[in-house]
């Protein structure tokens, strides 16, 4: 999934009606986006209904969940779901897998997540391919002879693994087509992730997995309102991933206050604890020109794909329109001028 021109995607939260997914995905395709993803965050809708709705309304854009996790959805079910999306989209599905966030509060055991992801990938791959030899994993296994009771359209689909950690990144370097840093707009993370996946020049056998940078996006000509909205939207994610970025020093006071503010008062109050400098490392926020500059900086750092995440703008439709009509052309014009 690398080696060609940079690719661009939009990521949607799973909190809409089917008609909204159809309309927004159709608009994204119209503006030339390459990928439309649906998040798999805890307590939201599962990605599958949204992806099936998007498949009905589009014909070229790639579609997939970013991401499913094998701890709340067994790999056998994951295989069936991605096969359904691939069939509905006529071969445009990809599969995104990650360890998942917020699962500890449910008492879910995520011990040795990298190994669990490896085993989940093996189960999904065997089922899609029709390999009946079985998978003998510690966490996930498939008995010999097991197979899907329906025929997938393709024997494999592109694989994306989402992670902030070096162990799972190393796994992704050997398994995945893409690795996504979800919740980051920080150029400094790109070469670090490249090294973790084994893709830097210093590696004995460099691999080239595509690096995807995706984050909350709020683009609008009303810069003040856009950044205020972005602070609210990014606060729940910053509370999770803020500690994972070793290239950013977040003040202790911010980390200490953010979580309690979220739990006690919600994102509006927590937004007070997201300063400008931190916001720009974890979100795309501001005018179309500013967001385009952020995207170019990530591509210059070596990112292969940018995923502009929900809510996109002060309104869903307005955000997609500005991203497609102003941000994407500005980014492409800058790259072509070099």
Residue ranges and their predicted role:
Residues 1-338:
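Active-site-adjacent structural elements that line small-molecule/cofactor binding pockets in enzymes
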């Amino acid at each position: 999934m690398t080696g060609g021109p940079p690719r661009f995607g939009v990521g949607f939260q799973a909190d809409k009606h089917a008609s909204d997914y159809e309309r927004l995905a159709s608009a994204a395709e119209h503006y030339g986006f390459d990928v439309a993803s649906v998040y798999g965050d805890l307590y939201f809708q599962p990605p599958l209904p949204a992806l099936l709705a998007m498949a009905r309304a589009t014909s070229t854009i790639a579609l997939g969940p970013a991401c499913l996790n094998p701890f709340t959805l067994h790999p056998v079910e994951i295989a069936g779901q991605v096969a359904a999306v691939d069939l509905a989209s006529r071969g445009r599905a990809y599969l995104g897998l990650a360890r998942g966030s917020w699962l500890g509060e449910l008492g879910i055991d995520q011990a040795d997540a990298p190994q669990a992801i490896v085993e989940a990938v093996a189960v999904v791959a065997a089922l899609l391919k029709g390999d009946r030899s079985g998978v003998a994993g510690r966490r996930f296994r498939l008995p010999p002879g097991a197979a899907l009771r329906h025929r997938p359209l393709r024997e494999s689909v592109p694989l994306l693994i989402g992670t902030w950690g070096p162990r799972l990144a190393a796994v992704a370097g050997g398994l995945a087509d893409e690795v996504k840093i979800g919740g980051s707009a920080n150029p400094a993370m790109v070469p670090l992730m490249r090294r973790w996946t084994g893709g830097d020049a210093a590696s004995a056998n460099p691999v080239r997995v595509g690096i995807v940078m995706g984050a909350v996006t709020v683009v609008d000509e009303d810069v003040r309102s856009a950044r205020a909205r972005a602070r609210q939207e990014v606060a729940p994610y910053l509370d999770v991933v803020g500690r994972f970025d070793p290239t950013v020093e977040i003040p202790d006071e911010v980390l200490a206050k953010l979580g309690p503010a979220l739990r006690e008062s919600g994102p509006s109050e927590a937004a007070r604890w997201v300063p400008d400098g931190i916001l720009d490392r974890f979100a795309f926020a501001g005018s179309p020109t500013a967001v385009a500059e952020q995207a170019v900086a990530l591509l210059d750092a070596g990112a292969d794909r940018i995923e502009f995440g929900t809510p996109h703008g002060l309104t869903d439709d307005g955000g997609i329109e500005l991203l497609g009509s102003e941000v994407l052309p500005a980014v492409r014009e800058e790259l072509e001028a070099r």
